[in-house]
Regions:
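Conserved catalytic cores of phosphodiester-cleaving nucleases, focusing on short active-site segments
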Residues: 236, 259-276, 290
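Switch/connector loops and helix/strand junctions flanking conserved nucleotide-binding motifs
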Residues: 3-10, 280-283, 313-319
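Phosphate-binding site recognition
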Residues: 1-228, 243-244
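Mg2+/Mn2+-dependent nuclease catalytic core
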Residues: 276-293
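Hydrophobic/aromatic beta-strand patches that form the interior of the parallel beta-sheet core
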Residues: 16, 270-272, 304-308
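Domain-level recognition of nuclease-like catalytic cores that cleave nucleotide substrates
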Residues: 295, 299-323
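Active-site metal-binding core of divalent-cation-utilizing nuclease and nuclease-like domains
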Residues: 239-267
Length: 323
């Protein structure tokens, strides 16, 4: 991690900071060119072991372990630890997360009152994330310097960066780590439910997916946040984020308001509005009144509207509507 310049009484002083320089951006990882040029035999062996074509194996390596950027003009950088472990074991595992438990990170997220969805698509200037962690005013320096988020875009005109989770390995691992703090101590039950929900959505069965979700939430212990509508939004965000082939975002801006949750699958785009102690019809009416569907008319996929109403006393879904 980055640290402040030491005092004039220290032997180590006047350090040159190279952490955001383009000419050093690929020094701490493996670029795609290095992967293809130096590890071709490893790729072929992995593909054969997994029953994949060479191109499919490369695509899965990129999906799982690529995506790091360390400067405004940075090559895509693979996580070297996970990449080498994958080649060694010939399996697409979550190796980086298996090497340690992010307990400190979770505690700091609570301290700074960071919600799980707050980690996605963060806009910041350089001083807000490339900064010493000992006196950080936000959690961004810790998230960035420990590898949980990375640079995904840079706006040169306005000099700000967009930060996000780098890849599937980090996304799934971090989401699983957040489950005990935000949903239930039973992480296995949550991941199994997410897997069954994914199977339903693959068949475009949102009705079955919501029934599974309701059954699952009926097993979750009561917590004090169930009277807060945003709590249910975060629960849905965590569970849907475990659906690894889906893009999930919350509080998505439209010309007429903000959609609670937007989820993009291979076949559909889902607009999800969450209400508490009202009814699903009210949620659906808001989607129509604010004309949320128009915002996504050019996405190229059928748009499905989903209104969900939660009962705060039960801490569970009361009813829903799907169109």
């Amino acid at each position: 991690t980055k640290f402040s310049q030491l005092s004039i009484f220290s032997e180590l002083n006047n350090i040159t900071n190279i952490s955001m320089r383009d000419d050093y951006a690929g020094i701490c990882g493996i670029t795609k060119e290095e992967l293809l040029g130096n590890m071709s035999e490893d790729i072929n062996a992995l593909a054969e072991a997994q029953g994949l074509s060479r191109e499919e194996a490369i695509s899965k390596l990129k999906e799982n372990y690529d995506g790091y950027h360390f400067s405004p003009v940075s090559p895509d950088v693979f996580n070297p630890y996970s990449l080498l472990k994958c080649f060694d074991e010939k399996n697409f595992g979550a190796y980086w997360f298996a090497s340690g438990t992010p307990t400190y990170l979770i505690n700091m997220m609570k301290k700074f009152e960071v919600l799980p969805s707050d980690i996605s698509r963060v806009e910041a200037d350089e001083s807000e994330f490339d900064a010493p962690t000992e006196n950080m005013p936000t959690i961004l320096p810790l998230l960035y310097q420990s590898g949980y988020i990375t640079i995904k875009d840079y706006d040169k005109e306005f000099n700000y960066y967009t930060l996000d989770v780098p890849n599937k390995e980090v996304k799934v691992g971090l989401t699983k780590a957040l489950i005990p703090s935000y949903v239930t101590p039973n992480t296995l039950a949550t991941t199994n439910t997410a897997r069954r929900i994914a199977q339903c959505l693959a068949k475009q069965d949102m009705e079955g997916a919501l029934q599974l979700l309701k059954t699952y939430l009926g097993t979750v212990p009561y917590c004090n946040d169930t009277r807060y509508e945003g709590h249910y939004q975060q629960v849905l965000y965590i569970i849907f984020s475990l659906l690894t082939d889906y893009l999930v975002d919350v509080e998505v801006h439209t010309p007429h308001g903000r959609v609670d949750i937007v989820m993009l699958s291979r076949t559909n785009l889902y607009i999800i509005e969450v209400k508490m102690n009202k009814d699903a019809q009210t949620a659906m009416q808001q989607i129509d009144l604010k004309d949320y569907r128009q915002r996504f008319a050019l996405c190229g996929k059928p748009v499905v509207k989903v209104g969900i109403n939660f009962d705060s006393d039960k801490g569970n879904i009361e009813d829903w509507e799907i169109e």
